[in-house]
């Protein structure tokens, strides 16, 4: 986010999803985090590794963040073999739609609740 840490993904993203767990909600400041799943060996830190920190979220996940701006960059999951890269940190968005919500929030079946959707910001926004 601040640019202190940079990385590249050297293989196609395998999946995209929403996570509604309390850790992802808190670290994203939103109702969910949108992530891109990739094998961790294909996530290469190209700049600023010394600016990275990490912390254990639970027995199965470790979050990696930027020490300069505190942005969560990715979360190591599935015994550290995969990285859930925060989509908001990517310069190029993968061309695949989210396939799942984990753990699914009660309201996730209809996130818009019938509200209109816009391709551009309306004048009143």
Name each region found by the language model:
Residues 4-125:
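A short Gly-Trp-Pro
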């Amino acid at each position: 986010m601040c640019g202190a840490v940079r990385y590249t993904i050297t293989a196609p993203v395998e999946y995209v999803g929403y996570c509604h767990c309390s850790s992802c909600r808190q670290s994203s400041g939103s109702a969910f985090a949108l992530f891109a799943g990739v094998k961790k060996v294909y996530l290469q830190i190209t700049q600023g590794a010394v600016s990275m920190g990490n912390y254990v979220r639970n027995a199965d996940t470790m979050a990696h963040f930027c020490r300069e701006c505190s942005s969560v960059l990715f979360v190591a999951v599935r015994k550290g073999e995969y990285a859930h890269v925060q989509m908001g940190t990517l310069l190029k968005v993968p061309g695949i739609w989210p396939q799942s919500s984990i753990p699914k929030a009660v309201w996730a079946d209809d996130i818009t609740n019938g509200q209109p959707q816009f391709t551009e910001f309306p004048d009143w926004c």
